[in-house]
Amino acid sequence: MCPSEMGTLWYLWSPVLISLAALFSKVTEGRGILESIQRFSLLPTYLPVTYHINNADVSFFLKEANQDIMRNSSLQSRVESFLIYKSRRLPVLNASYGPFSLEQVVPQDLMLPSNPFGFTNTFSLNWRLKAYILQEKVYLSHPKVQVLFHIVGRDWDDHRDENLPCLRVFAFRETQEVRGSCRLGGALGLCVAQLEMLPGWFSPPSVVSGRRRPTEQPEGSPVELYYAVQPGDERGDCAKEDSRKSGGAPAGHNDVDESSPPLHRIGSVFLRETPSSPPLRELRLDSNVAVHYIPKTVRQGDVLTFPISVSRNCTEDRFTLRAKVKKGVSIVGVRASTSSLWDVKQSTEYTGKYAPAVIICQKKSAGSGKSVDDASYEVMKIDIEVEAPSDPPTTQLVTWQVEYPGEITSDLGVSKIYVSQKDLIGVIPLAMEAEILNTAILTGKTVAVPVKVISVEEDGTVQGLSDSVECRSSDEDVVKVSDRCDYVFVNGKEMKGKVNVVVTVTYQHLSSPLEMTVWVPRLPLQIEVSDMELNQIKGWRVPVVSNKRPARDSEEEDDDEKRGRGCTLQYQHAMVRVLTQFVAEAPDPGGHLAHLLGSDWQVDITELITDFMQVEEPRIAKLQGGQILTGQELGMTTIQILSPLSDAILAEKTITVLDEKVTITDLGVQLVTGLSLSLQLSPGSNRAIFATAVAQELLQRPKQEAAISCWVQFSDGSVTPLDIYDEKDFSLMATSLDEKVVSILQDPKFKWPIIAAENEGQGALVKVEMLISESCQKSKRKSVLAVGTASIKVKFGQNDANPNGSESGHLGAGLHVENINDRRSKKPFQEWGSPEGPYYSSSSMGLMEGWGSTTKRPTFPKKEGQENLLDDIILSQTMATDLTSFPDQVDLPGSNVGTEEHDPDQAAKGLSDLEIGMYALLGVFCLAILVFLINCVTFALKYRHKQVPFEEQEGLSHSHDWVGLSNRTELLGNHMNFASSQEEQITAIDRGLDFEESKLLLSSNSQNSINGQLFRSTGAMLTDDKEQKSEPPTSPTSKRKRVTFSTFSAISSDDGCPSGNTMVLSNEDDIKWVCQALDPGECPEPHSCMERLHEHV
């Protein structure tokens, strides 16, 4: 193609190419923003609602691995997970933002999905039912089985009259059963159920024809025990049942009511016809002589026999045994067991009732005992009688000592005789809690659990024990026990946690283990900082605090910036939280580490360790309240968490304050007219609960007001809620773009502007500007840091109880929504049903009269395919809204926004940015092809017969030479920057565009046209060229650019010279539009201009 044709084509195609590049930049811009957020920031965007849990003794907020961005990626909502670990009443979750606050009672079925006490009228969180079998071996002479039940986790100090349930106990053997029952009660919440075994059960199992005879087990015939929980009758008593007594008719399994509560296994007992010899305890005096006895409780008049044995390896032929007793018992006889081997004589040296017994033993021959397999053999037996017991019962002592010829004596040995008028069958230690959460490592405060030791008699009587109780912890590096055995505790000096650590409790000859689980925080703790590199924020000046010196002047700062005395550049802020996992070792060596919630869950413990957090170098960074980190000056330092009990450091995190400056590239704005709160059980854990707070948006009444929520995005990719910055360091100014629809109120009671509804309408009608503090404003210009826009929907006459314009109904599979907005007179809540479980929700209009607004989509775009817990809820609310009932879109200057009223479903669903971009791209391509074809046809028709001679063509200046005389390369290099930062997309002062751009819809720009030429507004003069060149194009911190759409007018000038489809991308001095070959008034139209040019040539 000839050069003249190329110039004409460039003249026609340049607007098309620029629009095409702008469109492509706009389509890919949304995804790039979120990718930058996810890549550089640990903090997702959300509605900055503050959650508080009330009425709970121990509770934590949680973090699930790799789920924060999935659940929190919208300025409209915030999803937070939490755990109610310990509570004596129903907890209440409070959600608040600005003037809005609402509360939601956490239902018990969310905290206890499978609660055995669900039918009771009391709050039973942390309640667990434990069963203790008091006799594992049952004999025909005493065929009773006793089971003690105890509620763990119930507050012993709360003596309210609770409707505790009844327990039914079942014993099964083959096709027969026996039953027993008891009702929980008392301060400890316990009871003892008793069952009497049938006599036939003690005989060997019957042999069924054709089956092998079951082998006899040495421990006896096993019988399985089960229990079921059931409510009591109207008086609180357990229902009567058929008692199975000896000779009673057997009952089968089918007798159990199928509609009754499920059975829970307790364990097994073993039945024997005759009791076996009880095991003897051995008291060894030395390597030769040992005393044996049967540990049991005795009464007045009982005679105890103590067998004395000698080791088979004994080389001594003579020894003397001395036995000394005190008042209350007496030695009544000494009998030789092996008279053929040993001569046993009692000395008469000491006389008297309580005189010590001296027994002289002389070996007769070298023979040994009867069994060569035994290590020792019995020599004699000593009988001791118990006299009148004392009150209270005491323990009698018998002292033993062996003496050999040559005055060689052994150590003293002591046997205890437990004297009591009661027949004790068991001692049970009861703990009020089944677990200990060792937070003492974090706070230095002791965590203790009360313990009570009780005794159970043969008739089922239960009594508390306080004296003569001994206890010992199996591992004091895990848990400790008090001297009086009245509580177990951890004091922060423990080294580990453990599942089912044992504390052994002993009373008289009875002992019993107390098993507990101890959870400890996993060290080192994890410090999570939303931004570990803090920079100065360019253009944001704040007053200098007295103890903080001003930041040094930068070479990039102009005279105006240096003139701001008493102010310094603001540093970025970051949010800090501390996370950990509570873990415990497995009871068996080599087992897997147990987690309180699971390996994917972490517990937020920031509030516990706030007093022990510090910044190593406070001059570099400052920690406010343990949760907000602020840069102070250039340097590197660490956040430390110190141990409250030692000099150890529990966690460290390095943070850096850099000398590089960042700019605010985006201001995300969300309008809030109220809050709604919903609760749902987490699908990943049966103990974690999700709380979802959603901003209500629709303005429904005249003068209804809405609050503002803002996030800022910086050029380094970090995003931060504006709430964490001191409100004295900035101000927000809102402007209504259509005061007929909304107006702006600046109430001094609230730190940010308030938007009020005036008339019906919708669109991006609110512009929000972020300004620096008044004391740091410059005299020449108003320092605006960022500009954002918010969309508004105002529809009057809509039902307050249903802001989305739809009746309550099923939205999706199994999700039932009931919207309740008016919280001025009551605080209702509703239940949402879903396949995952119950869903509870409530909503609030806030504490002010009529707050409201809406934003259709979040300012920060969502990544394609991203999951969100609110997707179903928000989608259902959107689908339920009839967009055709809204008034027409308010036309903004330079924007074309509309809705398809003929298709409500399509309008409600909307087109994604990618779809809009692809359709626009297709249209531009079609238009470009059409223009190209028209240009080719026109050129061929006009100039096929007007070929200029070659020598004349050399002197002909090309069409592009008179279109623009400036250097095209410099023009394109300096002014055709199609990529600008996200900041430049919304901030008018940075690019000097006198228009407001919606963040939700692609819109064209309004520009001033003067004599066919487009000029920049005076705002463009505010852009600092140095700031634009401060970073090289290849810098890793360079920002993603964007293209602004421009419309081109073709208005002829007054003098008749063609203006063409001219476009100016810079100042008017950069390109001079001339027609050197012709007079200005000779060109009525471009084609005649070309013809006259050829004639002149």
UniProtKB/Swiss-Prot annotation:
Keywords: Membrane, Signal, Transmembrane, Transmembrane helix. GO terms for cellular component: membrane. Residues 233-245 have a biased composition (Basic and acidic residues). Residues 1-30 form the signal peptide. The chain crosses the membrane at residues 914-934. InterPro entries: Ig_TMEM132_2nd (IPR055422), Ig_TMEM132_5th (IPR055423), Ig_TMEM132_6th (IPR055424), TMEM132 (IPR026307), TMEM132_3rd (IPR055421), TMEM132_C (IPR031436), TMEM132_M (IPR031437), TMEM132_N (IPR031435). Expressed in mature oligodendrocytes in the brain. It comes from the Eukaryota. Residues 935-1097 are cytoplasmic. Residues 31-913 are extracellular. Regulates neuronal morphology via inhibition of the WAVE regulatory complex (WCR), a complex that controls F-actin cytoskeletal dynamics. This is Transmembrane protein 132D. It comes from Rattus norvegicus (Rat).
